[in-house]
Regions:
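Conserved RecA-like ASCE P-loop NTPase motor core of nucleic-acid helicases/translocases
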Residues: 8-13, 75-84, 192-193
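Conserved strand-helix element at the start of the C-terminal RecA-like helicase core
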Residues: 70-94
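Catalytic core segments in nucleotide and nucleic-acid processing enzymes
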Residues: 85, 104-107, 114-115, 139-143, ...
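Long, largely alpha-helical accessory region at the distal end of helicase-like NTP-driven motors
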Residues: 86, 183-307, 313-314, 529-532
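Interdomain/boundary linker segments immediately adjacent to catalytic/signaling cores
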Residues: 337-340, 344-398
Length: 532
């Protein structure tokens, strides 16, 4: 596309998605791997990253939002970046100003002119916004960003451990936290809230995708949170505010500490192979678009043969291979798609050839299962962050796929064999657990049902009945099973009936379960996970 251009120069402190340079703009991987840098300047500006939940667990998302929405502003601006309208609504209900497509220019202009009244909330805009100096001295980075396109969201759901996906998420986060520091002398306190975002920034598995500068700022944030924990005389929110005040009053101790730590940054020398993979993806797609199907197939096959990734991601590329194969052989394409689906059940299910695999507790031990789950994590901190993020997703109002994934994870945490039949074979209940003596727990999840709903509808009762019939067909009428519907109301509509005994889990009971799991995890804090 750009072959006729002799030189293209792009200038940016960060990029939201540098994979587009290779796949979209057709840049050479070498150019993206080796950007022009000012070697004399390791960092610019001052970002005080604060993770309130690390200061004290009770200093959670809702507490931060509530306190800062109530703040009266006169000397500087406070801005919150949120990923969705749902997140935005919480701020609106507390009196915040929402910057919409229609008024965002006006609201940002007010901040730059020094007109401060209330916190300003910006929805899903992580780039293209400058908030220098007093226009934003406190930036709240609220929750993990979403991808904009359905294709990107599908890829994220299908390949959650993908280096490509996690690198793009990290770049989007970096774009966001850079909004409040726009120059060498600029400074801003950045509050990181939302358990999924905190986990992504702290976890060993994903922290590595940030730039060395951001990783160092996260390390500084963890360090000051640890130091702040020692202050037992003040409430957690006051401790957080005192940290921010140190930066705002230009405390010399803080400035020296920040500068000395940032000066120790060492640039990454490890070379990522991800850009070479992007080049191969682009080449295969180009062949396919040009009708060179055999070349597309062989190009994608070479890419797959050289992969060193988990099964979920390998399945993703097999699905691409199936797509390329379809014009030349439908039968072979379906065969490849079966292989892809067996590796990753988040992908498209073939019309035939996929059988349900029953779960059983034979040769299982619940305590050993719990130990195995916990030893996936390097330490208690990693375990705690992961469980917190999972339990946050196990909440009413959360998107169904996230809720059901969280429930599956909770089952594994508690030592059950845990499965999502509806997701994995497109038939059966949302979640199924199997415990000791093959005692099954069947779940139908209605997390997106409004909290004001009065009744369980006839259609919802019918769904539950169908899933109960499916279970009996697979496991027999004498299987030991408890059936649950997770929904905000317990009243069944006049038109509806259940064919089996169904227990209802409402918000209060779900909260009790989550609190008990949190309590269980906290009991493990004094122990090494390897010794449990």
């Amino acid at each position: 596309m750009l072959a006729f251009v002799l030189l293209v120069l792009l200038m940016s402190a960060t990029t939201q998605d540098d994979s587009f340079f290779v796949k979209g703009l057709e840049f050479r991987p070498e150019a993206v791997k080796n950007p022009l840098r000012n070697e004399k300047q390791k960092w610019s500006g001052e970002k005080m990253l604060i993770i309130p939940s690390l200061v004290e667990e009770s200093c959670d998302h809702d507490l931060i939002v509530t306190n800062f929405c109530k703040s009266s502003l006169s000397k500087f601006g406070i801005v919150a970046l949120v990923p969705s309208t749902k997140n935005c609504r919480q701020y609106q209900n507390l009196g915040a100003i929402t910057a919409t497509t229609g008024n965002i220019v006006e609201e940002l202009d007010k901040l730059k002119k020094g007109i401060f009244s209330k916190i300003v909330v910006i929805n899903n805009r992580y780039d293209g916004i400058d908030l220098p100096d007093e226009s934003c001295r406190i930036l709240i980075m609220d929750s993990l960003p979403y991808f904009d396109s359905l294709a990107d969201r599908y890829e994220e759901q299908a390949c959650p451990n993908s280096e490509l996906i996690n690198k793009r998420i990290a770049q989007k986060i970096e774009q966001g936290i850079g909004r409040g520091v726009r120059g060498e002398k600029d400074y801003c306190a950045i509050l990181i809230i939302g358990s999924e975002l905190v986990r992504f920034m702290r976890s060993i598995a994903t922290n590595k995708f940030f730039s060395p500068q951001t990783r160092k700022q996260i390390d500084i944030g963890i360090e000051i949170a640890d130091m702040a924990k020692e202050d037992k005389t003040e409430s957690p929110i006051k401790v957080v505010l005192s940290l921010i005040k140190q930066m705002l009053v230009r405390d010399e101790g803080w400035k020296e500490y920040y500068a000395s730590e940032m000066d120790t940054i060492v640039e990454d020398n490890a070379e990522s192979q991800v850009y070479d993979r992007l080049l191969k993806e682009r080449q295969a797609e180009q062949f396919f678009c040009e009708g060179e199907y055999e070349k597309a197939i062989s190009s994608m096959q070479r890419l797959i043969d050289g992969l060193n990734v988990d099964d979920t991601e390998k399945g993703w590329y097999l699905q691409q291979l199936a797509r390329y194969t379809y014009p030349t052989s439908i039968a072979e394409s379906i065969k490849i798609q079966k292989s892809a689906f067996k590796k990753n059940t988040q992908l498209l299910k073939p019309s035939t050839g996929i059988d349900y695999t029953k779960i059983s507790y034979i040769h299982q031990d619940r305590l050993n299962n719990i130990r195995t789950y916990m030893r996936k994590f390097s330490d208690y901190g990693e375990l705690f962050l992961s469980v917190n993020a999972t339990l946050d997703n196990l909440s009413f109002g959360i998107e169904a796929t996230k809720f059901e994934a969280a429930l599956k994870d909770v089952g594994a945490l508690l030592g059950y064999v845990s499965q999502r039949p509806d997701k994995e074979i497109r038939k059966g209940p949302d979640n199924l657990w199997c415990g000791s003596n093959d005692h099954y727990l069947l779940f139908e999840c209605k997390s997106e049902v409004s909290g004001t709903r009065q009744e369980i509808t006839k259609h919802e009762a019918g769904q539950m009945n169908n899933h109960c019939a499916w279970f009996e067909d697979q496991y027999g009428p004498n299987a030991n099973v408890d059936r649950f519907m997770i929904i905000s109301t317990k009243t069944l509509s006049y038109e509806g009936d259940f064919t089996h005994k169904v227990k209802i889990i409402r918000p209060n009971k779900l909260k009790i379960l989550k609190d008990q799991i949190k309590g269980f995890i906290k009991e493990l804090k004094p122990f090494s996970l390897d010794e449990i």
